[in-house]
Swiss-Prot record:
The lineage of its organism: Bacteria, Bacillati, Actinomycetota, Actinomycetes, Mycobacteriales. It is found in: Cytoplasm. CDD domains: UBA_RuvA_C. The keyword Plastid does not apply. Disulfide bonds: none annotated. Residues 1-63 are annotated as: Domain I. One of its GO terms (biological process) is DNA recombination. Residues 143-148 are annotated as: Flexible linker. Residues 64-142 are annotated as: Domain II. This is Holliday junction branch migration complex subunit RuvA.
Length: 202
């Protein structure tokens, strides 16, 4: 398993970054919070896990060991794959997820895109005892992320939310509202804020 990568950040997109290590570019899928810590042209070290399927090999990147461990724990739930596990960590940290699961906060878990009442109940039932080891995580400081132009940000974030299962009609007003309140916010910051608001409306 590829447990970590250290190299130069070549590219940063809405859902992934490309790190060049020893002349090889690795595409790493990650949460908005993790992507917000990277800067093009600078060296970075990213904790990773490799998910191997019959037709693909995908790298996922994390800001902390807890997030990576939670990524694996979430996938022990029947019917929950890496895409949904990453979506969960895009909305809440490992510590916050652990609190919600241990506290049987089904409504809070339903803020995660793709998680309805039944999946939330399965998370609680199957993981309540497994998440006790996760300490509450401090809120990530997203204010240091580089600013981006508001126009492209709206379109990019709406596109990312549609990819997560939201409709344009649901996503666009929320994204535009977030950008209006935080006109200098970077794309990962806007995406995370929009995810939180959309989850609260479910």
């Amino acid at each position: 398993m590829i447990a970590s990568l250290r190299g130069t950040v070549l590219d940063i997109q809405l859902d992934h970054a490309v790190l060049e290590c020893a002349g090889v570019g690795y595409k790493v899928l990650a949460t908005p919070a993790m992507l917000g810590t990277l800067q093009r042209g600078e060296e970075a070290r990213v904790m990773t896990t490799l998910v191997v399927k019959e037709d693909s090999m995908t790298l996922y990147g994390f800001t902390s060991q807890d997030d990576r461990d939670m990524f694996h724990v979430l996938q022990t739930v029947s019917g929950l794959g890496p895409k949904l596990a990453l979506a969960a960590l895009s909305v809440m940290s490992a510590g916050d997820l652990a609190q919600a699961i241990a506290g049987e906060e089904a409504a809070r878990l339903q803020k995660i895109p793709g998680v309805g009442k039944r999946v939330a109940q399965r998370l609680i039932l199957e993981l309540k005892d497994k998440v006790k080891a996760f300490a509450p995580a401090e809120s990530a400081d997203l204010s240091s992320a580089a600013p981006a132009a508001a126009g492209p940000v709206v379109e990019d974030v709406v596109e990312a939310l549609i990819g997560l299962g939201f409709t344009d009609k649901m996503a666009r007003p929320v994204v535009e509202s977030v950008v209006a309140e935080q006109p200098d916010a970077a794309t990962p910051v806007v995406l995370r804020a929009a995810l939180s608001q959309l989850g609260a409306k479910k």
